[in-house]
Protein backbone atom coordinates (compact mmCIF):
# COMPACT_ATOMS: atom_id res chain seq x y z
CA UNK A 1 0.00 0.00 0.00
CA UNK A 2 1.35 3.38 -0.96
CA UNK A 3 1.88 6.07 1.60
CA UNK A 4 -0.25 9.17 1.18
CA UNK A 5 1.94 12.12 0.27
CA UNK A 6 1.73 15.19 2.46
CA UNK A 7 3.81 18.33 2.62
CA UNK A 8 5.77 18.77 5.85
CA UNK A 9 4.36 21.32 8.22
CA UNK A 10 5.44 22.61 11.61
CA UNK A 11 2.53 21.16 13.54
CA UNK A 12 2.77 17.70 12.03
CA UNK A 13 -0.86 17.86 10.96
CA UNK A 14 -2.20 17.05 7.52
CA UNK A 15 -4.90 19.21 6.04
CA UNK A 16 -6.77 17.58 3.20
CA UNK A 17 -8.67 19.71 0.71
CA UNK A 18 -11.64 18.02 -0.81
CA UNK A 19 -11.72 17.82 -4.60
CA UNK A 20 -14.80 17.53 -6.77
CA UNK A 21 -14.44 13.75 -6.80
CA UNK A 22 -15.88 11.80 -3.91
CA UNK A 23 -13.39 8.98 -4.00
CA UNK A 24 -10.32 8.61 -1.87
CA UNK A 25 -8.04 8.42 -4.88
CA UNK A 26 -8.87 12.03 -5.71
CA UNK A 27 -8.46 13.56 -2.26
CA UNK A 28 -5.61 16.03 -2.60
CA UNK A 29 -3.42 17.48 0.12
CA UNK A 30 -2.52 21.11 0.46
CA UNK A 31 -0.52 23.33 2.77
CA UNK A 32 -2.19 24.02 6.10
CA UNK A 33 -3.90 27.35 6.65
CA UNK A 34 -1.91 30.22 8.13
CA UNK A 35 -0.96 29.88 11.80
CA UNK A 36 -3.54 32.47 12.80
CA UNK A 37 -6.35 30.11 11.77
CA UNK A 38 -4.87 26.98 13.29
CA UNK A 39 -5.09 26.11 16.96
CA UNK A 40 -2.48 23.50 17.73
CA UNK A 41 -3.44 21.14 20.54
CA UNK A 42 0.21 20.39 21.26
CA UNK A 43 3.60 20.49 19.65
CA UNK A 44 5.36 17.39 18.39
CA UNK A 45 7.87 17.64 21.19
CA UNK A 46 5.17 17.39 23.86
CA UNK A 47 2.70 14.57 24.49
CA UNK A 48 1.82 12.29 21.57
CA UNK A 49 -1.34 12.50 19.52
CA UNK A 50 -3.58 10.12 21.46
CA UNK A 51 -6.26 8.00 19.80
CA UNK A 52 -8.68 5.56 21.40
CA UNK A 53 -10.22 3.04 19.00
CA UNK A 54 -13.24 1.30 20.50
CA UNK A 55 -13.64 -2.11 18.90
CA UNK A 56 -11.21 -4.64 17.41
CA UNK A 57 -13.21 -5.85 14.42
CA UNK A 58 -13.03 -4.92 10.74
CA UNK A 59 -13.69 -1.22 11.32
CA UNK A 60 -11.44 -0.74 14.34
CA UNK A 61 -8.36 -2.54 13.03
CA UNK A 62 -8.60 -0.87 9.62
CA UNK A 63 -8.62 2.53 11.32
CA UNK A 64 -5.64 1.54 13.48
CA UNK A 65 -3.64 0.36 10.46
CA UNK A 66 -4.29 3.54 8.51
CA UNK A 67 -3.61 5.82 11.48
CA UNK A 68 -0.19 4.22 11.82
CA UNK A 69 0.39 4.24 8.07
CA UNK A 70 -0.73 7.82 7.38
CA UNK A 71 0.53 9.70 10.41
CA UNK A 72 3.42 12.07 9.61
CA UNK A 73 6.85 10.68 10.39
CA UNK A 74 7.50 13.50 12.86
CA UNK A 75 4.29 12.88 14.81
CA UNK A 76 4.42 10.96 18.06
CA UNK A 77 1.33 8.73 18.00
CA UNK A 78 -0.31 6.61 20.66
CA UNK A 79 -3.17 4.30 19.70
CA UNK A 80 -5.12 2.36 22.34
CA UNK A 81 -7.61 -0.31 21.23
CA UNK A 82 -10.43 -1.21 23.61
CA UNK A 83 -12.38 -4.45 23.13
CA UNK A 84 -13.66 -6.67 25.91
CA UNK A 85 -13.36 -9.87 23.84
CA UNK A 86 -10.14 -9.06 22.02
CA UNK A 87 -9.20 -9.22 18.35
CA UNK A 88 -12.03 -10.44 16.12
CA UNK A 89 -14.11 -11.65 19.03
CA UNK A 90 -17.33 -9.98 17.87
CA UNK A 91 -19.48 -10.20 14.76
CA UNK A 92 -16.53 -9.44 12.45
CA UNK A 93 -14.69 -12.54 13.58
CA UNK A 94 -17.55 -14.91 12.79
CA UNK A 95 -18.58 -13.39 9.45
CA UNK A 96 -18.88 -15.67 6.45
CA UNK A 97 -15.77 -14.23 4.83
CA UNK A 98 -17.02 -14.24 1.23
CA UNK A 99 -15.37 -11.19 -0.33
CA UNK A 100 -16.55 -9.62 -3.60
CA UNK A 101 -17.80 -6.13 -4.64
CA UNK A 102 -21.23 -7.05 -6.01
CA UNK A 103 -24.88 -6.96 -4.95
CA UNK A 104 -27.05 -10.11 -5.12
CA UNK A 105 -27.84 -9.08 -8.71
CA UNK A 106 -24.10 -8.89 -9.52
CA UNK A 107 -24.31 -5.11 -9.73
CA UNK A 108 -21.17 -3.27 -8.66
CA UNK A 109 -21.82 -1.76 -5.24
CA UNK A 110 -21.39 1.94 -4.48
CA UNK A 111 -17.66 2.72 -4.83
CA UNK A 112 -17.15 -1.01 -5.26
CA UNK A 113 -13.98 -0.60 -7.31
CA UNK A 114 -12.26 1.46 -4.62
CA UNK A 115 -13.49 -0.82 -1.85
CA UNK A 116 -12.24 -3.91 -3.67
CA UNK A 117 -8.86 -2.36 -4.45
CA UNK A 118 -8.19 -1.25 -0.88
CA UNK A 119 -9.46 -4.53 0.58
CA UNK A 120 -6.90 -6.37 -1.54
CA UNK A 121 -4.16 -4.05 -0.31
CA UNK A 122 -5.07 -4.56 3.33
CA UNK A 123 -5.31 -8.32 2.85
CA UNK A 124 -1.82 -8.30 1.36
CA UNK A 125 -0.55 -6.34 4.34
CA UNK A 126 -2.05 -8.91 6.70
CA UNK A 127 -0.61 -11.76 4.63
CA UNK A 128 2.84 -10.20 4.81
CA UNK A 129 2.49 -9.89 8.57
CA UNK A 130 1.41 -13.53 8.84
CA UNK A 131 4.68 -14.75 7.33
CA UNK A 132 6.92 -12.20 9.02
CA UNK A 133 9.55 -13.55 11.39
CA UNK A 134 8.36 -10.87 13.82
CA UNK A 135 4.90 -12.43 13.73
CA UNK A 136 5.54 -16.12 14.20
CA UNK A 137 4.57 -17.60 17.55
CA UNK A 138 3.61 -21.12 18.57
CA UNK A 139 -0.02 -20.04 18.67
CA UNK A 140 0.01 -18.22 15.35
CA UNK A 141 1.94 -20.72 13.25
CA UNK A 142 -0.89 -23.25 13.20
CA UNK A 143 -3.78 -20.88 12.49
CA UNK A 144 -2.50 -17.94 10.47
CA UNK A 145 -0.65 -19.77 7.74
CA UNK A 146 -3.21 -19.16 5.02
CA UNK A 147 -6.28 -17.21 6.06
CA UNK A 148 -6.82 -16.36 2.38
CA UNK A 149 -5.93 -19.82 1.08
CA UNK A 150 -9.44 -20.52 -0.21
CA UNK A 151 -8.95 -18.81 -3.56
CA UNK A 152 -11.69 -20.87 -5.15
CA UNK A 153 -13.88 -18.07 -6.39
CA UNK A 154 -17.61 -17.78 -5.76
CA UNK A 155 -20.50 -19.21 -7.79
CA UNK A 156 -23.92 -17.53 -7.86
CA UNK A 157 -26.63 -19.56 -9.62
CA UNK A 158 -29.52 -17.73 -11.27
CA UNK A 159 -32.62 -18.68 -9.30
CA UNK A 160 -35.45 -17.11 -11.33
CA UNK A 161 -35.98 -15.74 -14.82
CA UNK A 162 -36.29 -12.10 -13.74
CA UNK A 163 -33.15 -12.42 -11.66
CA UNK A 164 -31.24 -14.04 -14.52
CA UNK A 165 -32.05 -11.28 -17.02
CA UNK A 166 -30.87 -8.61 -14.59
CA UNK A 167 -27.73 -10.55 -13.76
CA UNK A 168 -26.84 -10.87 -17.44
CA UNK A 169 -27.10 -7.09 -17.84
CA UNK A 170 -24.96 -6.37 -14.79
CA UNK A 171 -22.21 -8.79 -15.80
CA UNK A 172 -21.27 -6.42 -18.63
CA UNK A 173 -20.09 -3.79 -16.12
CA UNK A 174 -18.03 -6.04 -13.84
CA UNK A 175 -14.54 -5.07 -12.66
CA UNK A 176 -11.55 -6.41 -14.62
CA UNK A 177 -9.92 -7.20 -11.27
CA UNK A 178 -12.95 -9.20 -10.09
CA UNK A 179 -14.49 -10.69 -13.19
CA UNK A 180 -17.94 -12.21 -13.47
CA UNK A 181 -18.22 -15.07 -15.95
CA UNK A 182 -21.50 -16.53 -17.22
CA UNK A 183 -21.48 -20.33 -17.07
CA UNK A 184 -23.88 -22.90 -18.46
CA UNK A 185 -24.68 -26.11 -16.63
CA UNK A 186 -21.82 -28.08 -18.17
CA UNK A 187 -19.25 -25.44 -17.28
CA UNK A 188 -20.59 -25.18 -13.73
CA UNK A 189 -20.48 -28.97 -13.32
CA UNK A 190 -16.81 -28.99 -14.30
CA UNK A 191 -16.14 -26.61 -11.40
CA UNK A 192 -18.49 -28.21 -8.89
CA UNK A 193 -19.92 -31.62 -9.78
CA UNK A 194 -23.45 -32.04 -8.48
CA UNK A 195 -24.38 -28.36 -8.36
CA UNK A 196 -27.93 -27.69 -9.54
CA UNK A 197 -28.74 -24.67 -11.73
CA UNK A 198 -32.52 -24.06 -11.90
CA UNK A 199 -32.15 -21.97 -15.06
CA UNK A 200 -29.06 -23.61 -16.52
CA UNK A 201 -27.01 -20.49 -15.75
CA UNK A 202 -24.61 -19.43 -13.03
CA UNK A 203 -22.34 -16.44 -12.54
CA UNK A 204 -18.80 -17.20 -11.48
CA UNK A 205 -16.41 -14.74 -9.82
CA UNK A 206 -12.99 -16.45 -10.08
CA UNK A 207 -11.10 -13.68 -8.22
CA UNK A 208 -13.58 -13.49 -5.33
CA UNK A 209 -12.17 -14.74 -2.03
CA UNK A 210 -13.18 -16.79 0.97
CA UNK A 211 -11.47 -15.33 4.05
CA UNK A 212 -11.14 -16.79 7.52
CA UNK A 213 -12.22 -13.54 9.13
CA UNK A 214 -10.93 -14.09 12.64
CA UNK A 215 -7.53 -15.30 11.49
CA UNK A 216 -7.33 -12.37 9.09
CA UNK A 217 -8.05 -9.89 11.88
CA UNK A 218 -5.44 -11.48 14.11
CA UNK A 219 -2.89 -11.19 11.31
CA UNK A 220 -3.89 -7.58 10.63
CA UNK A 221 -3.41 -6.72 14.30
CA UNK A 222 0.06 -8.28 14.16
CA UNK A 223 0.68 -6.17 11.08
CA UNK A 224 -0.28 -3.08 13.06
CA UNK A 225 2.15 -4.07 15.82
CA UNK A 226 4.94 -4.58 13.30
CA UNK A 227 4.14 -1.27 11.59
CA UNK A 228 4.26 0.61 14.90
CA UNK A 229 7.57 -1.01 15.78
CA UNK A 230 9.13 -0.32 12.39
CA UNK A 231 7.90 3.28 12.33
CA UNK A 232 9.40 3.95 15.75
CA UNK A 233 12.71 2.49 14.57
CA UNK A 234 12.92 4.30 11.24
CA UNK A 235 11.24 7.62 12.03
CA UNK A 236 12.16 10.38 14.43
CA UNK A 237 8.93 9.83 16.34
CA UNK A 238 7.39 7.15 18.53
CA UNK A 239 4.35 5.10 17.46
CA UNK A 240 2.74 3.26 20.36
CA UNK A 241 0.02 0.60 20.06
CA UNK A 242 -1.77 -1.14 22.93
CA UNK A 243 -4.73 -3.51 23.23
CA UNK A 244 -6.93 -3.27 26.33
CA UNK A 245 -9.35 -6.15 26.91
CA UNK A 246 -11.98 -4.34 28.90
CA UNK A 247 -15.51 -3.11 28.50
CA UNK A 248 -16.38 0.45 27.57
CA UNK A 249 -19.45 1.72 29.39
CA UNK A 250 -19.63 5.33 28.26
CA UNK A 251 -17.71 7.81 26.11
CA UNK A 252 -17.17 10.14 29.03
CA UNK A 253 -14.58 7.64 30.33
CA UNK A 254 -12.18 9.01 27.72
CA UNK A 255 -12.82 12.72 28.22
CA UNK A 256 -9.57 14.62 28.54
CA UNK A 257 -7.35 11.58 28.03
CA UNK A 258 -7.46 11.35 24.23
CA UNK A 259 -7.29 13.72 21.29
CA UNK A 260 -9.58 11.47 19.24
CA UNK A 261 -11.98 8.68 20.14
CA UNK A 262 -13.18 6.51 17.23
CA UNK A 263 -16.24 4.37 17.97
CA UNK A 264 -16.12 1.09 16.00
CA UNK A 265 -18.31 -1.08 18.21
CA UNK A 266 -20.74 -2.46 15.65
CA UNK A 267 -24.10 -3.37 17.18
CA UNK A 268 -22.73 -2.74 20.68
CA UNK A 269 -22.66 0.99 19.97
CA UNK A 270 -26.19 1.21 21.38
CA UNK A 271 -24.82 0.19 24.78
CA UNK A 272 -23.18 3.60 25.08
CA UNK A 273 -25.65 5.94 26.81
CA UNK A 274 -24.43 8.90 24.77
CA UNK A 275 -25.44 7.15 21.52
CA UNK A 276 -28.23 4.79 22.55
CA UNK A 277 -31.29 5.38 20.36
CA UNK A 278 -29.62 8.19 18.43
CA UNK A 279 -28.28 6.26 15.45
CA UNK A 280 -30.32 4.94 12.49
CA UNK A 281 -29.13 1.37 12.97
CA UNK A 282 -31.08 -1.87 13.15
CA UNK A 283 -29.73 -4.97 14.82
CA UNK A 284 -29.86 -8.40 13.24
CA UNK A 285 -28.52 -11.64 14.69
CA UNK A 286 -27.08 -14.16 12.27
CA UNK A 287 -26.32 -17.82 12.94
CA UNK A 288 -23.72 -19.72 10.92
CA UNK A 289 -23.71 -23.54 10.94
CA UNK A 290 -20.50 -25.53 10.75
CA UNK A 291 -20.72 -28.78 8.76
CA UNK A 292 -18.25 -31.61 8.19
CA UNK A 293 -18.08 -34.66 5.95
CA UNK A 294 -16.86 -38.05 7.15
CA UNK A 295 -13.25 -38.70 6.20
CA UNK A 296 -14.16 -41.83 4.24
CA UNK A 297 -16.45 -39.86 1.91
CA UNK A 298 -15.39 -37.98 -1.19
CA UNK A 299 -14.77 -34.40 -0.17
CA UNK A 300 -15.67 -31.06 -1.70
CA UNK A 301 -13.63 -30.55 -4.91
CA UNK A 302 -10.22 -29.05 -4.23
CA UNK A 303 -10.90 -26.06 -6.47
CA UNK A 304 -14.66 -26.05 -6.02
CA UNK A 305 -16.04 -22.53 -5.52
CA UNK A 306 -18.03 -21.29 -2.56
CA UNK A 307 -21.71 -20.66 -3.30
CA UNK A 308 -23.93 -17.59 -2.95
CA UNK A 309 -27.68 -18.11 -3.11
CA UNK A 310 -30.60 -17.83 -0.68
CA UNK A 311 -28.12 -19.45 1.70
CA UNK A 312 -24.36 -19.30 1.22
CA UNK A 313 -21.72 -22.00 1.49
CA UNK A 314 -18.20 -20.93 2.48
CA UNK A 315 -15.80 -23.80 1.88
CA UNK A 316 -13.17 -24.32 4.57
CA UNK A 317 -11.63 -27.52 3.19
CA UNK A 318 -12.58 -30.78 1.45
CA UNK A 319 -14.42 -31.99 4.55
CA UNK A 320 -15.39 -28.71 6.21
CA UNK A 321 -17.70 -25.83 5.31
CA UNK A 322 -19.74 -23.05 6.85
CA UNK A 323 -23.40 -22.52 6.00
CA UNK A 324 -25.18 -19.23 6.56
CA UNK A 325 -26.83 -17.17 7.51
CA UNK A 326 -30.04 -16.54 9.39
CA UNK A 327 -31.49 -13.06 9.88
CA UNK A 328 -33.14 -12.41 13.24
CA UNK A 329 -34.12 -8.75 13.14
CA UNK A 330 -34.33 -6.61 16.28
CA UNK A 331 -32.35 -9.13 18.30
CA UNK A 332 -30.17 -7.74 21.08
CA UNK A 333 -28.33 -11.02 21.68
CA UNK A 334 -24.66 -10.42 20.86
CA UNK A 335 -23.39 -13.70 22.30
CA UNK A 336 -21.41 -15.86 19.86
CA UNK A 337 -22.78 -18.93 21.63
CA UNK A 338 -25.71 -20.73 20.02
CA UNK A 339 -28.14 -22.89 21.99
CA UNK A 340 -29.19 -26.30 20.66
CA UNK A 341 -32.67 -24.94 20.00
CA UNK A 342 -31.36 -21.92 18.07
CA UNK A 343 -28.99 -24.16 16.10
CA UNK A 344 -31.80 -26.56 15.23
CA UNK A 345 -33.99 -23.74 13.95
CA UNK A 346 -31.10 -22.34 11.92
CA UNK A 347 -30.49 -25.71 10.26
CA UNK A 348 -34.18 -26.09 9.47
CA UNK A 349 -34.04 -22.74 7.70
CA UNK A 350 -30.67 -23.00 5.96
CA UNK A 351 -30.38 -26.62 4.81
CA UNK A 352 -33.41 -26.60 2.46
CA UNK A 353 -32.12 -23.42 0.81
CA UNK A 354 -28.60 -24.79 0.38
CA UNK A 355 -29.69 -28.25 -0.80
CA UNK A 356 -31.72 -26.68 -3.60
CA UNK A 357 -28.47 -25.58 -5.22
CA UNK A 358 -26.05 -28.15 -3.79
CA UNK A 359 -28.00 -31.35 -3.02
CA UNK A 360 -24.86 -33.09 -1.76
CA UNK A 361 -24.90 -30.98 1.39
CA UNK A 362 -27.46 -33.42 2.84
CA UNK A 363 -24.58 -35.85 3.42
CA UNK A 364 -22.73 -33.37 5.62
CA UNK A 365 -22.97 -33.52 9.41
CA UNK A 366 -23.67 -30.57 11.71
CA UNK A 367 -20.80 -30.02 14.16
CA UNK A 368 -21.49 -26.62 15.69
CA UNK A 369 -22.76 -23.09 15.24
CA UNK A 370 -21.74 -19.56 16.05
CA UNK A 371 -23.53 -16.25 15.85
CA UNK A 372 -22.97 -12.52 15.64
CA UNK A 373 -25.06 -9.39 15.97
CA UNK A 374 -24.92 -7.14 12.92
CA UNK A 375 -25.47 -3.37 12.94
CA UNK A 376 -27.48 -2.74 9.77
CA UNK A 377 -27.55 0.78 8.28
CA UNK A 378 -30.61 2.34 6.63
CA UNK A 379 -31.34 1.68 2.96
CA UNK A 380 -30.62 4.61 0.63
CA UNK A 381 -30.90 5.09 -3.12
CA UNK A 382 -27.23 4.03 -3.29
CA UNK A 383 -27.75 0.93 -1.18
CA UNK A 384 -27.12 0.28 2.51
CA UNK A 385 -24.16 2.53 3.29
CA UNK A 386 -22.16 2.57 6.54
CA UNK A 387 -22.30 5.52 8.92
CA UNK A 388 -19.19 7.67 9.30
CA UNK A 389 -18.48 11.08 10.73
CA UNK A 390 -17.85 13.28 13.70
CA UNK A 391 -20.43 12.71 16.45
CA UNK A 392 -19.69 15.65 18.74
CA UNK A 393 -22.94 17.24 17.61
CA UNK A 394 -24.81 13.96 18.24
CA UNK A 395 -23.51 13.53 21.79
CA UNK A 396 -23.58 17.22 22.64
CA UNK A 397 -19.87 17.96 22.58
CA UNK A 398 -19.34 20.56 19.88
CA UNK A 399 -16.36 22.36 21.37
CA UNK A 400 -13.75 20.24 19.55
CA UNK A 401 -13.95 17.60 16.82
CA UNK A 402 -12.69 14.56 18.66
CA UNK A 403 -15.44 11.91 18.80
CA UNK A 404 -15.96 9.86 15.65
CA UNK A 405 -18.24 7.06 14.48
CA UNK A 406 -17.40 4.25 12.05
CA UNK A 407 -20.34 1.88 12.11
CA UNK A 408 -23.20 0.24 10.29
CA UNK A 409 -21.05 -2.07 8.19
CA UNK A 410 -23.87 -4.60 8.22
CA UNK A 411 -23.04 -7.75 6.28
CA UNK A 412 -20.41 -6.08 4.08
CA UNK A 413 -17.74 -5.23 6.62
CA UNK A 414 -15.04 -7.21 4.84
CA UNK A 415 -15.57 -5.24 1.63
CA UNK A 416 -16.01 -1.76 3.14
CA UNK A 417 -13.57 -1.80 6.04
CA UNK A 418 -10.30 -1.04 4.23
CA UNK A 419 -11.34 2.01 2.21
CA UNK A 420 -13.55 3.50 4.90
CA UNK A 421 -10.90 2.93 7.55
CA UNK A 422 -8.53 4.86 5.31
CA UNK A 423 -11.01 7.74 5.05
CA UNK A 424 -11.64 7.74 8.79
CA UNK A 425 -7.93 7.89 9.58
CA UNK A 426 -7.55 10.86 7.23
CA UNK A 427 -10.44 12.66 8.90
CA UNK A 428 -9.09 12.00 12.40
CA UNK A 429 -5.53 13.09 11.60
CA UNK A 430 -6.68 16.24 9.81
CA UNK A 431 -9.59 17.10 12.14
CA UNK A 432 -11.63 17.54 8.96
CA UNK A 433 -14.87 15.62 8.47
CA UNK A 434 -15.13 16.79 4.86
CA UNK A 435 -12.60 14.11 3.89
CA UNK A 436 -15.45 11.62 4.28
CA UNK A 437 -17.86 11.49 1.30
CA UNK A 438 -21.18 13.18 2.00
CA UNK A 439 -23.02 9.94 1.20
CA UNK A 440 -21.54 8.41 4.35
CA UNK A 441 -22.46 11.43 6.49
CA UNK A 442 -26.01 11.92 5.24
CA UNK A 443 -27.40 9.97 8.21
CA UNK A 444 -26.97 13.07 10.35
CA UNK A 445 -30.04 15.29 10.41
CA UNK A 446 -28.12 18.55 10.01
CA UNK A 447 -24.90 19.55 8.29
CA UNK A 448 -22.00 18.62 10.59
CA UNK A 449 -20.44 21.37 12.64
CA UNK A 450 -17.22 19.45 13.20
CA UNK A 451 -14.88 21.07 10.70
CA UNK A 452 -12.45 22.46 13.25
CA UNK A 453 -8.82 22.54 12.16
CA UNK A 454 -6.33 22.39 15.02
Task: Pin down the residues of each PLM region.
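Dinucleotide-binding Rossmann-like beta1-alpha1 core, especially the glycine-rich loop
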Residues: 96-191
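C-terminal catalytic lobe of FAD-dependent flavoproteins
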Residues: 360, 364-454
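Glycine-rich FAD pyrophosphate-binding loop
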Residues: 68-93
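N-terminal chloroplast transit peptides
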Residues: 1-29
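Central helical "cap/lid" subdomain
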Residues: 246, 250-307, 336-347, 360-364, ...
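Beta1/beta-strand and adjacent pyrophosphate-binding region of the FAD-binding site
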Residues: 43-59, 80
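Active-site lid/adjacent beta-loop-alpha segment flanking the redox-cofactor pocket in flavoenzymes
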Residues: 297-401
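Helical element adjacent to the flavin cofactor pocket in flavoenzyme catalytic cores
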Residues: 196-260, 264-273
Amino acid sequence: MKNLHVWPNPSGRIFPCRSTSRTLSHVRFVHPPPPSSVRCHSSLTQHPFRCAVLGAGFAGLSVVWHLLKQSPKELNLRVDIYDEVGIGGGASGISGGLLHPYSPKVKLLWEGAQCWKESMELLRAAEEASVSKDYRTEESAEHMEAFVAHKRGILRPATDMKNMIKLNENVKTCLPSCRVQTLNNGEAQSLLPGVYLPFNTAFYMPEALNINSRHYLQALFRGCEILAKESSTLDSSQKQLSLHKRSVHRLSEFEGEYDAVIVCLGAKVNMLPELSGRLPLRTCRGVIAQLELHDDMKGYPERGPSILSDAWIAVQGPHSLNLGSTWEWKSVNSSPNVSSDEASKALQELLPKASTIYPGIKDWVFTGARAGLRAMPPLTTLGSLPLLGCINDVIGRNHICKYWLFGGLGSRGLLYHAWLGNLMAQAVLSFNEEVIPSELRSWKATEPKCNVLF
